[in-house]
A protein has these predicted regions:
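A conserved mid-domain beta-alpha-beta active-site/ligand-binding segment of alpha/beta enzyme cores
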Residues: 211-271
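Short, flexible loop segments at boundaries between secondary-structure elements
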Residues: 187-222
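Active-site beta-strand->loop->alpha-helix modules in alpha/beta enzyme cores, enriched
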Residues: 2-178, 182-192, 235-236, 264-274, ...
């Protein structure tokens, strides 16, 4: 069976930008390895769930769900730190991966498997110390991501490797894209054909474009200018006749892992608290003019 590696810069990126591709591979019997590059520690959402920052009240950022100030004492959980947010986000990713693994197989009895790896890169690894997610990616950030990816490529040479585009405006996403791009370019230009399985694994590497950058022609569509010139930019369309089934599975099963609110079980809906509009745009109700899809390039 094919072995597929998905390098997710933070927990939720695998669902928001690569989820349909993951479902396709699982439903067709592939072994899918999710590599969470970092825990996604974040003080901002910790402040939201704590209801306070520097002594000032913080109103929840998802008013459609609950337009109030959170209170750990009232709602029954220990106040959060950036570290506990990271732990909770990893749990969300594992829950989402488990829901993906339950997708009905295309061929009865031919089931894909899931494995979750946590690379443990520090928060803001793409540009350490920058203080801004959109700061330019640094050589150190690319090197950190490259070391993680190369470890899996070396261990599993006969495999497929996917991550986010180097054109993404978030430096952690871009670090993963540049890292895999450098490995791919080296494989194409430097690796001898005697190492055919290693070479083929990286030659087939692909890069997914964040939903934020799909609307290249919309007046309000901000996107890195080089996205439109990426080689091989196309919709991931291997799912064919199963498209609607995968969409329904994502909408009705998988994204609940990032929306569920159950503090007693360690579920805090962190994905939705952080980027509610991304979840809304990626997974609209059935019949919406917007489609669930993944956009990638070579």
């Amino acid at each position: 069976m094919a072995r597929v590696f998905i390098y997710s810069p933070h927990p939720d990126d695998e669902v928001l930008s690569m989820g349909l591709a993951m479902l396709h591979y699982l439903a067709n019997g592939s072994d899918v390895h999710l590599v969470s590059m970092s825990n996604g520690e974040a003080q901002g959402v910790a402040n939201t769930l704590n209801g306070t920052a520097n002594g000032n009240p913080v109103v929840c950022s998802t008013p459609a769900d609950h337009p109030y100030i959170h209170s750990p004492a009232r709602e029954g959980y220990t106040p959060h730190t950036a570290a506990t947010i990271g732990d909770a986000r990893i749990k969300e990713a594992r829950a989402a991966l488990g829901a993906m693994a339950m997708v009905p197989p295309v061929t009865p009895g031919v089931l894909g498997t899931v494995t979750h790896h946590v690379a443990g890169l520090p928060a803001e690894y793409g540009a350490p110390g920058s203080g801004s997610s959109t700061a330019p990616v640094t050589p150190e950030g690319i090197a950190a991501a490259k070391a993680v990816i190369k470890g899996f490529v070396d261990e599993y040479p006969n495999s497929f490797h996917y991550t986010m585009s180097q054109s993404d405006d978030h430096h952690d996403h871009a670090a993963c894209g540049f890292a895999l791009r450098e490995l791919k370019d080296d494989a194409v230009n430097k690796v001898p054909w005697a190492d055919i399985t290693y070479k083929q694994a990286l030659v087939n590497a692909r890069f997914f474009v964040s939903r934020l950058y799909w609307a290249l022609s919309q007046p309000d569509g901000q996107y890195p200018p080089d996205v439109a010139s990426m080689p091989g930019l196309s919709w991931f369309n291997y799912y064919g006749a199963n498209y609607d089934r995968y969409c329904d599975w994502m909408r009705n099963q998988v994204i609940d892992a990032y929306r569920a609110w159950n503090p007693a079980a360690g579920a805090y809906g962190i994905g939705y608290h952080q980027v509610p509009t991304q979840f809304t745009r990626c997974f609209p109700p059935a019949g919406s003019a917007e489609k669930i899809a993944n956009l990638w390039h070579a």
